[in-house]
Amino acid sequence: MTLGRDAMTPLTILSVSETIYHNLLTSMVQDIVSRTTSRQQLQDARYPGLAPLHHDQRGALDVYGRPKPQEASVYFRCPNCSRDLSANRFAAHLERCMSRGARRG
């Protein structure tokens, strides 16, 4: 009879599969940690003074920690029909406008 990790535990399919699973998980976690650490060290070497992005729970500040602009009169021109649209409606208009053009042709 062959023994497992402990001298008292007999080698079974369950014990072998648990050992393989444990080794696989450990290897995956170590790989992820190693890659993340390497990326962070490379980023720190390339950009030594890089400040992390700011996260505001209230939503009043942008990712750089500055107050969000309250100007709602930002307009974009539709490349399909050349209409000027407000920024908050641009994506919805573009979806409708582009699908309308595809149906015509």
UniProtKB/Swiss-Prot annotation:
GO terms for cellular component: DUBm complex; SAGA complex; SLIK (SAGA-like) complex. GO terms for molecular function: enzyme activator activity; transcription coactivator activity; zinc ion binding. It comes from the Eukaryota. Gene3D superfamilies: 1.10.287.210, Classic Zinc Finger. Pfam families: Sgf11 (PF08209), Sgf11_N (PF18519). InterPro entries: SAGA_su_Sgf11 (IPR013246), Sgf11_N (IPR041216). A zinc finger (SGF11-type) spans 76-97. It is found in: Nucleus. Keywords: Activator, Chromatin regulator, Metal-binding, Nucleus, Transcription, Transcription regulation, Zinc, Zinc-finger. Functions as a component of the transcription regulatory histone acetylation (HAT) complex SAGA. At the promoters, SAGA is required for recruitment of the basal transcription machinery. It influences RNA polymerase II transcriptional activity through different activities such as TBP interaction and promoter selectivity, interaction with transcription activators, and chromatin modification through histone acetylation and deubiquitination. SAGA acetylates nucleosomal histone H3 to some extent (to form H3K9ac, H3K14ac, H3K18ac and H3K23ac). Belongs to the SGF11 family. The long N-terminal helix forms part of the 'assembly lobe' of the SAGA deubiquitination module. This is SAGA-associated factor 11. It comes from Eremothecium gossypii (strain ATCC 10895 / CBS 109.51 / FGSC 9923 / NRRL Y-1056) (Yeast). The lineage of its organism: Eukaryota, Fungi, Dikarya, Ascomycota, Saccharomycotina.
